[in-house]
C-alpha cells in the first residue's frame, strides 16, 4: 500500500510524497489543488486531487461516481451512507482495481433519521464534542466509525457519525486487508 498522509492542518495547494509500505521507499507525489486552480508549472509528480471541479489536467483523480470507464485513476472516500464500507469497497475494486485511490476523510456529520438524501450536516469540533459528551457512543463495524443515536427536544431522531484516530486505523486496516494500493488523507501514524 502507498500512503499519502496529509500534513496536520495542511492547506490546499501542496504536494505530498507517497510512501510505499512494501518497498519502504518514497513513491510518486500527489498534489492537492484548491478548487479552480491549476498545478504549478514545476509539478511533474504523478497525480492531482481536488474535490471541486475546475482542473482539466489529465493527472487529476476522478471521483468514481462520474469517472469514465477508462479513467487512469479514480478516488472514493470512506464515508458511506447505508450498507457497509467493506461492501462498498468490494463493489469498487473489481471495477477499478489498482486505479482506485481511497480518500481517508474522517467523518463528523449529523443526520436526521430517516435521511432519504443520505446527506448529513457537517459539525465542527466544538459541536461534536458537545454531542458526544451528552450521548453515549457506539462503534459501527459496518460503517467503521462511531455513532450516537438520540432524540432532540422535539422528539426528532438523529444519528451523529464520527471518526476517531482508532476508527481511522480500523479503516486503514480494512483497506490493507482488501488490497487497496493507494490511500491518501488524514492517516493516523501507527
Can you describe what each PLM-predicted range is?
Residues 1-80:
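Chitinase-like catalytic core of GlcNAc-active glycosidases
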Residues 39-40, 83-85, 110-114:
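Extracytoplasmic/secreted cell-surface and envelope-processing proteins
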Residues 72-84, 155-160:
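Surface-exposed cleft-lining segments at the edges of enzyme active sites
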Residues 78-99:
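Catalytic-core region of carbohydrate-active enzymes that cleave or remodel glycosidic bonds
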Residues 97-170:
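Glycan-binding loop/region signatures in secreted carbohydrate-active enzymes
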Residues 178-190:
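Acidic/aromatic/glycine-rich contiguous surface patches that form carbohydrate-binding/processing clefts
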Amino acid at each position: 500500500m502507498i500512503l499519502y498522509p496529509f500534513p496536520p492542518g495542511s492547506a490546499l495547494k501542496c504536494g505530498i510524497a507517497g510512501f510505499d509500505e512494501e518497498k519502504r521507499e518514497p513513491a510518486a507525489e500527489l498534489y492537492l489543488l484548491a478548487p479552480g486552480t491549476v498545478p504549478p508549472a514545476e509539478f511533474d509528480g504523478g497525480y492531482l486531487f481536488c474535490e471541486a471541479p475546475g482542473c482539466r489536467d489529465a493527472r487529476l483523480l476522478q471521483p468514481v461516481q462520474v469517472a469514465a470507464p477508462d479513467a487512469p485513476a479514480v478516488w472514493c472516500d470512506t464515508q458511506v451512507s447505508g450498507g457497509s464500507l467493506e461492501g462498498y469497497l468490494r463493489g469498487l475494486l473489481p471495477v477499478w482495481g489498482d486505479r482506485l485511490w481511497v480518500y481517508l476523510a474522517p467523518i463528523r456529520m449529523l443526520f436526521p433519521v430517516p435521511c432519504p438524501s443520505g446527506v448529513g450536516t457537517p459539525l465542527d469540533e466544538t459541536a461534536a464534542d458537545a454531542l458526544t459528551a451528552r450521548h453515549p457512543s457506539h462503534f459501527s463495524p459496518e460503517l467503521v466509525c462511531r455513532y450516537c443515536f438520540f432524540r432532540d427536544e422535539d422528539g426528532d431522531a438523529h444519528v451523529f457519525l464520527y471518526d476517531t484516530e482508532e476508527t481511522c486505523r480500523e479503516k486503514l486496516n480494512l483497506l490493507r486487508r482488501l488490497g487497496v494500493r493507494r490511500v491518501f488523507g488524514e492517516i493516523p501514524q501507527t
